From Swiss-Prot:
It is found in: Cytoplasm. This is Probable transcriptional regulatory protein Helmi_17570. The keyword Nucleotide-binding does not apply. Keywords: Cytoplasm, DNA-binding, Transcription, Transcription regulation. Belongs to the TACO1 family. HAMAP family: Transcrip_reg_TACO1. It comes from Heliobacterium modesticaldum (strain ATCC 51547 / Ice1). One of its GO terms (biological process) is regulation of DNA-templated transcription. GO terms for molecular function: DNA binding. One of its GO terms (cellular component) is cytosol.
Length: 255
């Protein structure tokens, strides 16, 4: 897909994510609270909540935790002071970065995010400086190899099935496939792919870059990975998006 960034795939490779379940649960819980507060506790009529619940289950979040977060949000008590903010900036090498955050103290969060950018050689920018590079899309990740009897992905067949169900495009990598949709078509396409026998790993609305930068310099690549790791590990950051690919040879050098 034009503009598709492999950074999402690079993120999924990180084994240390398993050691951060507590932090992941906190971030997902925050999303559940805000989604329920804004759209109500019924996922059938609240698409944002439905996606958040799916993400919680994909990360093996206990059902009791999910329900407690929804009840807190629907009750309008806890989580009422969370503010949703978007930050934009440039990382090492001029890479565009978008950050979605939830915070109870915008001054603290802005200062800490600005520090992370500066430390990496990048800079936090003004609103609108890089948002035009990204567009919201539904992204459905599929297992490429058989999982519990699910269908093996054949690229040509998947393309036909995906387009018939309303998808925009697909990207097939060695370890997984991705199907891209309009945000409002995400759930319908996800269900159609599951009904067709594919193993759906995740489905979410995300920001996809319209164009990408190929990073071939090891030093810049290392700084970018450290910055993205630091952003994603920040307590207030829900999502971090960037428009770069790292050359395979450079990734091998980094290890």
């Amino acid at each position: 897909m034009a503009g598709h960034s492999k950074w999402a795939n690079i993120k999924h490779r990180k084994a240390k994510v398993d050691a951060q379940k507590g932090k992941i649960f906190t971030k997902i819980g925050r999303e559940l609270i805000v989604a329920a507060r804004q759209g109500g506790p019924d996922p059938n009529s609240n698409f944002r909540l439905k996606i958040a619940i799916q993400k919680a289950k994909e990360n093996n979040m206990p059902n009791d935790n999910i329900q407690r977060a929804i009840q807190r949000g629907a009750g309008g008590t806890e989580g009422a002071n969370y503010e949703e903010l978007t930050y934009e900036g440039y990382g090492p090498g001029g890479v565009a970065i978008m950050i979605e955050a939830m915070t109870d103290n915008r001054n603290r969060t802005a200062g800490e995010i600005r520090h992370l950018f500066s430390k990496s050689g990048g800079n936090l920018g003004e609103t609108g400086c890089v948002s035009w590079i990204f567009e919201p899309k539904g992204v459905i990740r599929l297992a490429v190899t058989p999982e519990a009897g699910a269908k093996v992905v054949d690229e040509d067949e998947l393309m036909l099935v995906a387009l018939e169900t309303g998808a925009l495009d697909i990207a097939v990598e060695e370890d997984e496939a991705e199907v891209f949709t309009l945000p409002e078509e995400l759930e319908g396409v996800r269900q159609a792919l599951a009904d067709a026998g594919y193993a759906v790993l995740s489905a979410e609305v995300t920001l996809v870059p319209k164009n990408t930068m190929e990073v071939t310099d090891k030093d810049i690549a290392t700084k970018l990975i450290k910055l993205m790791d630091a952003l994603e590990e920040h307590d207030d950051v829900q999502n971090a998006y960037a428009n770069f690919n790292i050359d395979d040879a450079v990734m091998e050098q980094i290890g």
